[in-house]
Amino acid sequence: MSGLQQRTLALAASVRKGEISARDLTVKTLADIEARDKDYNCVTRLLMHRALEAAERVDRLVLQGQDPGPLAGVPFGIKDLFDVRGEITTAGSKVLANDPPATQDATLVAHMIAAGAIPIALTNMDEFAYGFATINAHYGNTRNPHAPERLAGGSSGGSAAGVAARMFSISLGSDTNGSIRVPASLCGIWGLRATQGRLSVEGSYPFVPSLDTVGPFADSAGGLKACFEALCARSLADVDVGSLRIARLGGWFGENMSAPMQTAIDTLSMALGATDVVELPEVARARAAAFVISASEGAGQHLKRLRTQAADYDPAVRDRLLAGALLPSTLIFQAHRLRHWFRDRMHEAFAKTDILLAPALVGEAPRFDQPEIEIGGKMVSARANLGLYTQPLTLAGFPVLTVPMKVPGLPLGAQLIARPGREDQLFALAEKLETDGLAEARLI
């Protein structure tokens, strides 16, 4: 079996004990990615110099008897919209290919390195994070490690697929409308969209400032928690899982699931005792508002470059950005009003519950040659509707953890949603699900 053989926490423990050299592990990981990534296209650039530099620092601290950090020696991937010192941040586009290299690391990258993690590679993404599929006209498409003829999801697809393929144990992504949750579900790994504003976006290329959020992917619930603690530079308090009140989202989130997804969500709900059903109002309008805000703010980020470099954009992304620039201000204003209204309704939904459960997607990963899927008895765009269940929740800015449910066949993910700032509750439940055998990352 190729790739990393230990999961995040075990790997870090082995490095801290001196059982494994961080440098040797890094050299092997770099060689493994170079040999195997042709099958999946997760990585756009290897960070050989930075990786070896970080690994040698970790080994030096271990030899000196000092603590190298909770993620000592653990390789991590970085979505190519985070600044890495000495590298050009492309955000998945040729448009930025001639920009000057970053002079310092993004805040989250710096936090990861400070925790002992090894920056191993920049990962593929949809151009400027505008998509759910990691279909990229410039750097190629990322393929799902579980079925290379299928989508890995996006826009953080390279970060998710790289974890699933054991190329790195953890990775950084961003999530505006589902860009962590969708690929985590399709690739069968753990992912977290943090509470909006909780993790720094400094040094990351923006897409939709009103909605942009960042977060980690990992090969285990414990690894995801350790990564999050490193990113926010603080330890989370323990939570009594038995005291958590869990309910299931119904209505919009209870419709249109494939039979395997329906069965998986029903099974998980039963195991959690989530008998209460909560229905959010105006979910379809919330999703529409997310589309409007994304299109308008995304366009605003690119108008200047579109005037001079329009031909360098992926035509599909360029068309969406140009359409967003033409949206009337009254529509944008209404979308933001609905955003605030929907956030209030989300807060009300937690009056009698601590965690809400919902499917992450309608079903399994679509094939590349499958432009449409059936939803509600109609054939609709497969790629645009990957965010059917993730996009409405975007408006509220609440934390959402994606759970890789233990199911036969291709991976399926569930969303666990908590109040803002209560990632501790999400991690407590995630670790219990993993311990109880109800959830597990699917690595190849």
Put a short name on every predicted segment.
Residues 18, 29, 73, 114, ...:
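Glycine-rich, small-residue loops and helix-cap segments
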Residues 73, 213, 230-292, 314-317, ...:
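Gly/Ser-rich, acidic/histidine-flanked active-site/gating loops
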Residues 22-27, 56-59, 259-279, 303-308, ...:
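Acyltransferase
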Residues 63-74, 238-246, 353, 357:
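Flexible, low-complexity linker/loop segments at domain and module junctions
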Residues 71-94, 292-343, 347, 368, ...:
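Short helix-loop capping/hinge segments that flank enzyme active sites or metal/cofactor-binding pockets
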Residues 35, 114, 164-252, 266-267, ...:
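Structural helix-boundary/capping segments
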Residues 1-52, 270, 442-444:
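An N-terminal boundary/leader segment
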Residues 71-211, 360-378:
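Short glycine/serine-rich loop/turn segments
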